[in-house]
Amino acid sequence: MARRIKFQRLAEMRPTMTRFSTVALIVSKSSPNIFYDKMSGTERGVLSLTIRDSPNHLTNCKCWGQRDCVDEYAAMLQIGHVVDIVGAKVMSIPFAAPGEQRYQPQATVSCALVVNEGSGYVVRHDNDDFGQITILQQLLHQPIRPLGAVLKLADVRSGLGFPDKIITTNVNLLVVVAAVRPVRQIKRKLQGPLSEVQELLQCLEVIVIDASYPEGMLLSVWQPDWIQRAQQWQPRRTVLHLIDVRVSYSNFHRSLVLSHSNCTLICENPQAAGDDCRLLLAFAATVPLTTFSGCDQAELDNMPAVASIQAQMTVRQIYSRAEGELQDPSIHQFTAVLYGMVTKFDLDGLTSHVNRKCIACQQHIPRNLQDCASDACQQYFSLDNDEPRSISYFNINIHLSDQTGTLVEARLAGHPAERILGLRAEDFERLAEREKSELKWRFLLKYFEVRLMIKKPVGVRNHLVIVVVDMQAIPLEKLVANMVVF
């Protein structure tokens, strides 16, 4: 007859226990760490689970074993699962000095668990015990720390009170998702003797906002399980309580960014007393989604009227005002009239100049997809199969040069592109190569008066966006008459 397992609560853990068993909810999970064990001559590994069995009790459980065992745990155990942890060893958590780097989430109790292959194990809890599973899974949405004890994004952006010192630290935030970008694959060289071997990592970038900073901050997610969950987050609907999220300065984005690290905990759509989440969602509903499309979507909202663009600038002046010595940090965009020559307009090349956006959410559709992948959009389309699901629009890179330099970021896009080129995006795709070449030479190496809208780099978009609002062909005499030195 099988021995009946005695399950205990996390609050009952004592450092002297060597066969501790409990039923708990997985609220976070690390990636498996696999290494070569010289003593046994085999590959071993460790997987860390962060578990919780009540609103006040949370700790970590490390699962050690042969690689096959750890890989099986990694595939079987997911965030949100209720599990039985059997035969674990209870370990006292050593004291960590303030500011000391941590490699796992901070526990709310003084002990942690260790499960060794052969003496203990972790399995999914019996599905027939529906009552306990339901109770424990509700903890997934209960805040781990008070929602009132969070910082505002504006405070983080200002350098946590030290704007002259860029520091790396961990903070607690209450934010709402504004945009979820596609997963990117990044190659990283492995350290040591295998330095020529490259590891393929996945990264998901999420833009989060709060009422103090509607421009948004970038949150990078690297852990595969959290990437999978983040892909289900809905813009303006998913609230995140971020615990110990890493804040650091990114040279690539040239601003402070957030990162999900080994010690970070995320509570999705926290359910707590008070109006914090309700007020945050109400604010998010007022923020347009297209604000975070950046350069991926060519059609920019609120295009200025052509007649309103009057300030003449050279290429050098545009760059100086956008990124150089003349920039004003309080101004995020401006307009300019540029007199110059079109020096690149590769309409007949191999690069595609037509993109597509979803008619429902107005977001860019990647070229490898037929329709928008959003569940909400798919549900919308299922109600009416005859309605077009996407709109094509121009997105053409154009180089403009004058006596001071070349503007390489300018783009002829959307409705202005159709007006200037004299045809729709759908019609352009049907042109023969000879016709595309003829269209190109109507502009290339010709002189134009170009009206531009310039959007300066911001934290969630680290590059300059320059959009052609209008352009008119001019004779050489007018170009010379409008030349300036700087």
From Swiss-Prot:
GO cellular component: protein-containing complex
DNA-binding region(s) from the entry: 166-285
Biological process (GO), any one: oocyte fate determination
Pfam families: OB_MEIOB_N
UniProt keyword list: DNA-binding, Meiosis
Molecular function in Gene Ontology: single-stranded DNA 3'-5' DNA exonuclease activity; single-stranded DNA binding
InterPro entries: MEIOB, NA-bd_OB-fold, OB_MEIOB_N
KO phenotype (gene knockout): Reduced meiotic crossover formation and sensitivity to the DNA-damaging agent methyl methanesulfonate (MMS).
DNA-binding listed as a keyword: yes
PANTHER family associated with the record: CELL DIVISION CONTROL PROTEIN 24 OB DOMAIN-CONTAINING PROTEIN-RELATED
Family of the protein in this entry: Belongs to the MEIOB family.
Quaternary context: Interacts with mei-9 and Ercc1.
Function, in words: Single-stranded DNA-binding protein required for meiosis. May be involved in the resolution of recombination intermediates into crossovers in the meiotic recombination pathway.
Protein name, per record: Protein hold'em
Gene: hdm
